[in-house]
Amino acid sequence: MKDAVVITVGNEVLKGRTVNTNASFIGNFLTYQGYRVKLGLTVMDDLEDISWAFKTAMDRGDVIVSSGGLGPTFDDMTVEGFAKAIGSDNKLNQDALAMIEEKYKNIEITPERKKMAMMPEVCKPIRNPVGTAPGLLCSVGGKKVVILPGVPMEMQALLESMRDSLAIENSCYFDESINITGIMESTFAPYVERVMREVDGVYVKSHPKNIEVVNPSLEIEVSAYDVSQEAARKKVKDAIARIRAYAETILDSKDK
């Protein structure tokens, strides 16, 4: 299994002005691609912080996906921060420049617009089907680094276009949830651990939906990775069957 790290960049996210839906989308995308999302980082539009985030991410993950900070303004410095992290310089990428010129037909390519074509030589531009700034796909020491715009519709479109580039073999993910009523989370906690011991490779997580001591209700999420979707699905279904059986036993004992 390969590990992934998600980085989001932007003062507006840290201040709470913008809800960080990008991190959720990227995390979900990578999980269903078969990656284990190990770490999420959110940093300011600050060169040192961005550089630190990429260094940390490359220490922890096989694939790193960032969003935010690819535009033409003074505080769009994600690519510069990545270059600093790997000890590289940004250079004008002609393919990226051509993509930008295509977007700005009959409009002057100012230094601010040309900035969006600057990147380290280890990166190649990815055409943005929605906005103007290209995404970047970079390869550093056997790791993939994907740098995406922060505008959600642009980020999503670019990430979807890179699905094949980010595919991995022999790692598939499957999950399923069930609802249980009438059992408190603290009561069911030992059975969650028991199922994880009984079915190798599954992860079981309980999510309380109501106030525990008043009207207990649980959503039980079961997930697994395996070499195929069917193998992961089989593990999850086995675990769910055991969870249902334990829940029925607990509820039956309460009725007696």
From Swiss-Prot:
Signal peptide: none
Pfam families (alphabetical): MoCF_biosynth (PF00994)
InterPro entries named in the record: CinA (IPR050101), CinA_Arc (IPR023055), MoaB/Mog-like_dom_sf (IPR036425), MoaB/Mog_dom (IPR001453)
Family: Belongs to the CinA family.
Name of the molecule in the record: Protein TV0584
Source species: Thermoplasma volcanium (strain ATCC 51530 / DSM 4299 / JCM 9571 / NBRC 15438 / GSS1)
